[in-house]
């Protein structure tokens, strides 16, 4: 008798993806973040759906509808804070997932990596538009500042900004379309995740050694299903601790003030997960230059497969590259800190140095270290 799991047209897709999938026997906890990101996406779509049932995308009522969710809807406060802090957990997992790919050379799976970069852009766009929806001070001014950056594009810039705004300033039309995009994008992201997995399953997973693991594979279930379950337990514990004990830890107090176009907050800054890119944007005195640096700070990830000059795939056996990688991580922490500081001395200088170091490490120092390590292999 044939097993339904292996013959049913739909169930066999799940079987080949999560049950009988051959996986390397030595993948570490760094490979848990894919499933955690899937969980984060599911949490965000689910909590977002329930929030959308009570939210009104109108400048007059948006702020009070969020207040209504927190005060009057059954467990509305829980749903709202799970959604807000779920975004933070999403980005923590994202950064760790991308960092893992950089460290272990997973970017040599060209299609999987590039779909991943597109996913990163889509998630950043979704998070930005979601931040605008509560219509607090930081929502309004964040939307104004970031959309205004497009005016730096020569010739069509101003027209483009007014087209996105749906008027001459961020107003009702902007809020309505941002809500529409914020609702539809997660489903597009879910579809892209399927493509991401499709390309990954064409090649199979990478592993910490960076070596071909075809001779030593184990089934995904039960080994990695139980391992993922442990990761999920940790993630939910962290998320619920944040939600139930300090839900506003990562938010901005200014967003508890309703949006007022006549009063600019003293320090306009995005959510913490955008601060590194915001610091790079601010470190260049020219508007167009800043916008290009901002876009390129993420787009540079697509160059990783081209900049890989080492004879070894993973950094596991490359101490020089390891050192430089961790300097890059420290640099990103520095940029995140600077992004939240006011634009004054010494923060401007620190931000500029950190920005130069960020691009230098990726474009020059890491490839140079790879060449040195190649030479050392011959000695």
Swiss-Prot record:
Its cofactor is heme b. Heme b b566 binds at residues 97, 196. It is a multi-pass membrane protein. It is found in: Mitochondrion inner membrane. Pfam families: Cytochrom_B_C, Cytochrome_B. One of its GO terms (molecular function) is metal ion binding. Keywords: Electron transport, Heme, Iron, Membrane, Metal-binding, Mitochondrion, Mitochondrion inner membrane, Respiratory chain, Transmembrane, Transmembrane helix, Transport, Ubiquinone. Gene3D superfamilies: Cytochrome Bc1 Complex, Chain C (1.20.810.10). One of its GO terms (biological process) is mitochondrial electron transport, ubiquinol to cytochrome c. Coiled coil: none annotated. GO terms for cellular component: mitochondrial inner membrane; respiratory chain complex III. Binds 2 heme b groups non-covalently. PROSITE patterns: CYTB_CTER, CYTB_NTER. InterPro entries: Cyt_b/b6_C, Cyt_b/b6_C_sf, Cyt_b/b6_N, Cytb/b6-like_sf, Cytochrome_b, Cytochrome_b_C_euk/bac, Cytochrome_b_N_euk/bac, Di-haem_cyt_TM. Heme b b562 binds at residues 83, 182. It comes from the Eukaryota. A ubiquinone binds at residue 201. Component of the ubiquinol-cytochrome c reductase complex (complex III or cytochrome b-c1 complex) that is part of the mitochondrial respiratory chain. The b-c1 complex mediates electron transfer from ubiquinol to cytochrome c. Contributes to the generation of a proton gradient across the mitochondrial membrane that is then used for ATP synthesis. PANTHER family: CYTOCHROME B (PTHR19271:SF16). Heme 1 (or BL or b562) is low-potential and absorbs at about 562 nm, and heme 2 (or BH or b566) is high-potential and absorbs at about 566 nm. Belongs to the cytochrome b family. The cytochrome bc1 complex contains 11 subunits: 3 respiratory subunits (MT-CYB, CYC1 and UQCRFS1), 2 core proteins (UQCRC1 and UQCRC2) and 6 low-molecular weight proteins (UQCRH/QCR6, UQCRB/QCR7, UQCRQ/QCR8, UQCR10/QCR9, UQCR11/QCR10 and a cleavage product of UQCRFS1). This cytochrome bc1 complex then forms a dimer. This is Cytochrome b. It comes from Xerospermophilus tereticaudus (Round-tailed ground squirrel). The gene is MT-CYB.
């Amino acid at each position: 008798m044939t097993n339904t799991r292996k013959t049913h047209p739909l169930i066999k897709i799940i079987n080949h993806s999560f049950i009988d999938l051959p996986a390397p026997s030595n993948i570490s906890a760094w490979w848990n973040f894919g499933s955690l990101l899937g969980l984060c996406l599911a949490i965000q779509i689910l909590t977002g759906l329930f929030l959308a049932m009570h939210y009104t995308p109108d400048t007059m009522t948006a702020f009070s509808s969020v207040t209504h969710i927190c005060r009057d809807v059954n467990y509305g406060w829980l749903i709202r804070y799970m959604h807000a802090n779920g975004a933070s957990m999403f980005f923590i997992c994202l950064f760790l997932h991308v960092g893992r790919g950089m460290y272990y050379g997973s970017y040599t799976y060209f299609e999987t990596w590039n779909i991943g970069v597109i996913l990163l852009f889509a998630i950043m766009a979704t998070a930005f538009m979601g931040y605008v929806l509560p219509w607090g001070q930081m929502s309004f001014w964040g939307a104004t500042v970031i959309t205004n950056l497009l005016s730096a594009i020569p010739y069509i810039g101003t027209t483009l900004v007014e087209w996105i705004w749906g008027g001459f300033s961020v107003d009702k039309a902007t809020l309505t379309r941002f809500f529409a995009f914020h609702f539809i994008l997660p489903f597009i992201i879910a579809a892209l995740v399927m493509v991401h997995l499709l390309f990954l399953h064409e090649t199979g997973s990478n592993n910490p050694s960076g070596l071909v693991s075809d001779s030593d594979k184990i089934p995904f279930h039960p080994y990695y299903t139980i391992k993922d379950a442990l990761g999920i337990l940790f993630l939910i514990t962290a998320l619920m601790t944040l939600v139930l004990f300090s839900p506003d830890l990562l938010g901005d107090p200014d967003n508890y003030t309703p949006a007022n176009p006549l009063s600019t907050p003293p320090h306009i800054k995005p959510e913490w997960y955008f601060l590194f890119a915001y610091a790079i944007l601010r470190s260049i005195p020219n508007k167009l230059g800043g916008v290009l640096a901002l876009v390129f700070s993420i787009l540079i990830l697509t160059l990783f497969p081209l900049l890989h000059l080492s004879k070894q795939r993973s950094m596991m056996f490359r101490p020089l590259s390891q050192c430089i990688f961790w300097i890059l991580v420290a640099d990103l922490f520095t940029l995140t800190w600077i992004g939240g500081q006011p634009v004054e001395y010494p923060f401007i200088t620190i931000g500029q140095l950190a920005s130069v170091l960020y691009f230098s490490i990726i474009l020059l120092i890491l490839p140079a270290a790879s060449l040195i390590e190649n030479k050392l292999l011959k000695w």
